[in-house]
A protein has these predicted regions:
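Alpha-helix capping/helix-boundary segments
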Residues: 15-16, 42, 75, 106, ...
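Short, well-structured N-terminal submotif of metal-dependent ribonuclease cores
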Residues: 1-42, 47-66
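Histidine- and aromatic-rich ligand-binding microenvironments
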Residues: 11-12, 38-39, 98-100, 121-122, ...
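Acidic, PIN/NYN-like endoribonuclease modules and their adjacent C-terminal/linker elements
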Residues: 1-8, 107, 111-140
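Short, hinge-like loop/turn segments at secondary-structure boundaries
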Residues: 53-57, 86-87, 134-138
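Residue-level signal for well-ordered alpha-helical positions
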Residues: 22-23, 49, 82, 128-131
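Active-site neighborhoods of divalent-metal-dependent phosphate/nucleic-acid chemistry enzymes
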Residues: 3, 68-120
Length: 140
């Protein structure tokens, strides 16, 4: 009997928010060949942006039902250095640097666990890929 290799994926916050609001990716997620994992930074972003009780419940339910990964010290340190390099290279404003720092944390965590990042935010993740290779899938 041949064993199938399981492919891991992390859905970026942008995918969760869009699917929560519109249901646009429900079928795509259900039929995906990936085994989805959660990471603490995505849960942080979802909870930080939750305004209504149903949004908070959604984020907490995700955290309870996904196998969660927490960022390591090495990822935090690498993320700081990488975000600074990107900010300098692209001449980003302070707010953009703050937003990008979460995407860098997501990318580096996915890389560390061998997962694919699935996002709607193509440009920022492709910019990150210029400095660190990781698997990326962009949904439209």
């Amino acid at each position: 009997m041949r064993l199938r290799t399981v492919k891991l994926a992390i859905l970026d916050t942008s995918v969760y928010i869009e699917n929560f609001r519109t249901g646009r990716f429900t079928q795509q997620i259900a039929e995906s060949p990936f085994l989805f994992r959660g990471i603490s930074v995505v849960m942080h972003e979802l909870l930080r942006g939750a305004r209504a009780p149903i949004e908070r419940e959604f984020a907490l339910e995700l955290a309870a039902n996904l196998r969660m990964y927490t960022l390591t010290e090495r990822i935090w340190l690498d993320s700081g250095a990488l975000t600074a390099r990107l900010a300098a290279a692209k001449d980003y404003e302070k707010r953009k640097v703050q937003e990008l720092s979460f995407d860098v944390l997501i990318a580096l965590t996915a890389r560390a666990i061998g997962a694919t990042v699935i996002t709607l935010n193509r440009q920022d993740f492709e910019d990150i890929q210029q400095y660190r290779r990781f698997q990326l899938m962009c949904w439209e």
